[in-house]
């Protein structure tokens, strides 16, 4: 018994001694006209400045207007959290991680990507209001994020779910006229989605094809673009809703031939 107690105490001591898992700390390199420096980086929104702490624990402050470039290292926990949202497996843990990343990486490159996936996680939980709030926290600091970049698509999806069509249409128009091909293609897909969200009536299917999916297929035909593959898949679904199976099959075949590696080519 004495030996058992000694072993148990040793085990407990070892457990107590284990270090807590450290969360991601933003690190990277700040470049100015006079040189560059690397270390832990945070953004102070109130002062519009970056604070860098180097390996010698020295802190340097850079005003935003004197910084030429900020290169941030990708957070180690981001990809695993994204995978959990994509598979809807371990969603609560993924959301907790993404909430932290969105906060800690504020104005540091990966806040938009983390927020986009965080919003998708909230939507999987059926909480469009939370998804909108998460996106708008980023948009307040960077208004362009409402119609371009990694947050925008998730924001539009949340607006569709929440029935906020007036705000959605303004943002889709901005994205389409922005000159950014990726933003424009994504916006046209969401314009189609907004029509289909009203139901599978023939008129909605026609609108989704005319104003959304077919425009992407004709104007933004790029097999490497996720929006193009998505438009082919959803265009086929819309034709199917109109009982035009030959057109639906043509788009499905086009999707498999041109975008075989896309997840949309494997979707049912």
Predicted features and spans:
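Compositionally biased alpha-helical segments
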Residues: 21-141, 153, 157, 161, ...
């Amino acid at each position: 018994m004495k030996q058992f107690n000694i072993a148990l105490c040793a085990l407990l001591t070892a457990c107590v001694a284990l270090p807590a898992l450290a969360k991601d700390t933003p690190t990277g390199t700040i470049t100015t006209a006079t040189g560059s420096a690397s270390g832990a980086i945070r953004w102070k929104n109130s002062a519009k400045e970056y604070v860098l702490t180097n390996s010698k624990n020295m802190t340097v402050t850079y005003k935003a207007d004197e910084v030429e470039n900020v290169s941030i290292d990708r957070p180690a926990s981001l990809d695993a959290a994204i995978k959990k949202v994509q598979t809807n497996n371990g969603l609560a843990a993924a959301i907790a991680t993404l909430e932290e990343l969105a906060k800690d990486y504020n104005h540091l490159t990966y806040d938009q990507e983390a927020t986009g996936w965080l919003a998708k996680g909230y939507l999987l939980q059926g909480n469009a209001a939370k998804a909108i709030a998460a996106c708008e926290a980023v948009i307040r600091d960077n208004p362009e994020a409402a119609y371009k970049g990694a947050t925008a698509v998730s924001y539009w999806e949340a607006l569709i779910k929440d029935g906020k069509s007036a705000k959605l249409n303004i943002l889709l128009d901005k994205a389409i006229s922005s000159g950014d091909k990726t933003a424009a293609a994504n916006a046209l897909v969401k314009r189609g989605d907004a029509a289909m969200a009203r139901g599978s009536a023939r008129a909605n299917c026609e609108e989704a094809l005319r104003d959304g999916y077919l425009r992407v297929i004709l104007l933004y035909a790029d097999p490497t673009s996720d929006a193009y593959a998505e438009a082919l898949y959803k265009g086929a679904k819309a034709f199917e809703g109109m009982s035009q199976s030959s057109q639906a099959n043509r788009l499905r075949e086009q999707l498999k031939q041109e975008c075989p590696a896309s997840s949309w080519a494997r979707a049912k």
